[in-house]
């Protein structure tokens, strides 16, 4: 069992139940899934760019990404409906906890001038969105094999009803929020 999952089950649930006066263990919020999205704008003209993005996401997560397609045509971007323009991965279960552990303890501290993640990125329903400017913060990505520095969006979906509950959960898991 992953150490983050064990910490959640052994310590965090008890603390959350006391703090928010839950009557059942099932009311305590938990991390439901993590969605990692990498938009590849230059995939319209360069198909190799999308292949590299897919390969990098697969290295990070350990599962095959889903290629996302354009929903509608935009002439200004030379984009047609159905063209592949990005890749995404949805992580659940063990892989989700492994990725979250790696993100919090290894990758985020490697960001240049890192002072913590923003407290304002909650969506009002208990989910947290985090933008990463470069994929090089992850130890699996080899600097020499990267053709272009790309960012990604990481959405942490929780079962929490409010942002306050979600913030408390993520702080307990070790997410480094700004002071």
Swiss-Prot record:
- Please indicate if the UniProt record lists RNA-binding as a keyword: yes
Q: Which InterPro entries match?
A: Ribosomal_uL5, Ribosomal_uL5_bac-type, Ribosomal_uL5_C, Ribosomal_uL5_CS, Ribosomal_uL5_dom_sf, Ribosomal_uL5_N
Q: Which UniProt keywords apply?
A: Ribonucleoprotein, Ribosomal protein, RNA-binding, rRNA-binding, tRNA-binding
Recall the GO molecular function terms of this protein's record.
rRNA binding; structural constituent of ribosome; tRNA binding
Q: Briefly, what is this protein's role?
A: This is one of the proteins that bind and probably mediate the attachment of the 5S RNA into the large ribosomal subunit, where it forms part of the central protuberance. In the 70S ribosome it contacts protein S13 of the 30S subunit (bridge B1b), connecting the 2 subunits; this bridge is implicated in subunit movement. Contacts the P site tRNA; the 5S rRNA and some of its associated proteins might help stabilize positioning of ribosome-bound tRNAs.
PANTHER family (alphabetical) = 60S RIBOSOMAL PROTEIN L11-RELATED
Q: NCBIfam families, per this entry?
A: PRK00010.1
Name of the protein in question: Large ribosomal subunit protein uL5
* Originating species: Exiguobacterium sibiricum (strain DSM 17290 / CCUG 55495 / CIP 109462 / JCM 13490 / 255-15)
Provide the taxonomic classification. Answer: Bacteria, Bacillati, Bacillota, Bacilli, Bacillales
């Amino acid at each position: 069992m992953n150490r983050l999952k064990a910490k959640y089950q052994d310590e965090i649930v008890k603390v959350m139940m006391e703090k928010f006066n839950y009557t059942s263990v099932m009311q305590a919020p938990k991390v439901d899934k993590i969605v990692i999205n990498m938009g590849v704008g230059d995939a319209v003209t360069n198909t190799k760019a999308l292949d590299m993005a897919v390969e990098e996401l697969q290295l990070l997560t350990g599962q095959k990404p889903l290629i996302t397609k354009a929903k509608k045509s935009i002439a200004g971007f030379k984009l047609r409906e159905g063209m592949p323009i990005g890749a995404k991965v949805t992580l659940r279960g063990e892989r989700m906890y492994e990725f979250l552990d790696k993100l919090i303890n290894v990758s985020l501290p490697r960001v240049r001038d890192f002072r913590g993640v923003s407290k304002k990125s909650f969506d009002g329903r208990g989910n947290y969105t985090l933008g990463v400017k470069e994929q090089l913060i992850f130890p699996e990505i080899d600097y020499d094999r990267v053709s272009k520095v790309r960012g990604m969006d990481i959405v942490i979906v929780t079962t929490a009803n409010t942002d306050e509950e979600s913030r408390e959960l993520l702080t307990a898991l070790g997410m480094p929020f700004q002071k």
